[in-house]
Amino acid sequence: MTKSELIEILTKRQAHLKSDDVDLAVKSLLEMMGGALSGGDRIEIRGFGSFSLHYRPPRCGRNPKTGESVALPGKYVPHFKPGKELRERVASVVPLGECGDITE
C-alpha cells in the first residue's frame, strides 16, 4: 500500500472528512514521525510496533564497479519492531505468489 492508496482508503472510510484533510493528516503524521526519529526519539504505537534507530558501525565496503575497498562511516538507520498484536495478526498470512511454492 502506498501513501496515496492509504489516503484514498481513509477518505472512503471517513466520508465526513475531505480528501485534503485526510491528506494533510497523513502527511503531518509521517512528518512528525520522521522528525522524531531524526531527533533520536523512539516511537511506540501499542499493538502495532515501535520505530527506533539502530547504529551500524563503520565498515569496509567494496565499490562494485571497480572492486576497490572503500571505508564506510558508521551511521544510524531506522528500525521497526512489530508489536505482539501485529505479529499475531500476520502470522498465518501467506503472501501472494507463494501459495504454489508449498510442497507436501
Curated annotation (Swiss-Prot):
CDD domains: IHF_B. Keywords: DNA recombination, DNA-binding, Transcription, Transcription regulation, Translation regulation. GO terms for molecular function: DNA binding; structural constituent of chromatin. The keyword Endoplasmic reticulum does not apply. Gene3D superfamilies: IHF-like DNA-binding proteins (4.10.520.10). One of its GO terms (cellular component) is chromosome. SUPFAM superfamilies: IHF-like DNA-binding proteins. It holds the Pfam family Bac_DNA_binding. InterPro entries: Hist_DNA-bd (IPR000119), Histone-like_DNA-bd_CS (IPR020816), IHF-like_DNA-bd_dom_sf (IPR010992), IHF_beta (IPR005685). The keyword Ligase does not apply. GO terms for biological process: DNA recombination; regulation of DNA-templated transcription; regulation of translation. This protein is one of the two subunits of integration host factor, a specific DNA-binding protein that functions in genetic recombination as well as in transcriptional and translational control. Heterodimer of an alpha and a beta chain. HAMAP family: IHF_beta. PANTHER family: DNA-BINDING PROTEIN HU, INTEGRATION HOST FACTOR SUBUNIT BETA. NCBIfam families: hip, PRK00199.1. This is Integration host factor subunit beta. It comes from Xylella fastidiosa (strain Temecula1 / ATCC 700964).
